[in-house]
From Swiss-Prot:
Protein name: Small ribosomal subunit protein uS11
UniProt keywords, alphabetically: Ribonucleoprotein, Ribosomal protein, RNA-binding, rRNA-binding
Organism in which the protein naturally occurs: Chlorobium phaeobacteroides (strain DSM 266 / SMG 266 / 2430)
Quaternary structure, from the entry: Part of the 30S ribosomal subunit. Interacts with proteins S7 and S18. Binds to IF-3.
One GO biological process term: translation
Gene3D superfamilies assigned to the protein according to its UniProt record, in alphabetical order: Ribosomal protein S11
Taxonomic classification: Bacteria, Pseudomonadati, Chlorobiota, Chlorobiia, Chlorobiales
Gene name per UniProt: rpsK
Protein purpose: Located on the platform of the 30S subunit, it bridges several disparate RNA helices of the 16S rRNA. Forms part of the Shine-Dalgarno cleft in the 70S ribosome.
Length: 127
C-alpha cells in the first residue's frame, strides 16, 4: 500500500546565520546554517539542473546561491557570515548573489585548506 507523503514543516529561524560555500573544480555547494550549525537550506549546481563542465561556472554559482538564499530569506534569515572553501570559479559570483537575494553579508572568511607540503599533487594535464 502506498504511503502518504507529508510535506516537512518549515520552521522560522533566527535572523543570523552562516553560509558555507564549497567551490571545487567540478561543482559548487552552498549550505546555509543557523548559529548552532543546523542546516536551514542548501543547494548545489547539480540540484539546479547544471550538468558536466557547466557546474563549475560563475553563472551556476550565482543560480545556486540565489536558490539557497531565497529559501533562507523566506524562513526569516537576514544577516549572514560567509565561509568560502575551495579554488572554484564562482566564488565572487556566489557572494554577490547572496546580497542580491536580500541577505546582509557581515563578514567573508576564506577557509580553504592549504597543505604544508602534504600529499603529492596529481600529475600535470597535457591538453
Amino acid at each position: 500500500m502506498a504511503t502518504v507523503s507529508r510535506k516537512k514543516k518549515k520552521v522560522k529561524v533566527t535572523p543570523e546565520g552562516t553560509v558555507h560555500i564549497k567551490a571545487s573544480f567540478n561543482n559548487i555547494m552552498v549550505t546555509i546554517t543557523d548559529v548552532l550549525g543546523n542546516t536551514v537550506s542548501w543547494s548545489s549546481a547539480g540540484k539546479n539542473g547544471f550538468k558536466g563542465s557547466k557546474k563549475n561556472t560563475p553563472y551556476a554559482s550565482q543560480i545556486t546561491s540565489e536558490a539557497a538564499a531565497k529559501e533562507a530569506f523566506d524562513l526569516g534569515m537576514r544577516h549572514v557570515n560567509v565561509l568560502i572553501k575551495g579554488p572554484g570559479a564562482g566564488r565572487d559570483a556566489a557572494i554577490r548573489a547572496l546580497q542580491g537575494a536580500g541577505l546582509e553579508v557581515r563578514s567573508i572568511k576564506d577557509i580553504t585548506p592549504l597543505p604544508h607540503n602534504g600529499c603529492r599533487p596529481p600529475k600535470r594535464r597535457r591538453v
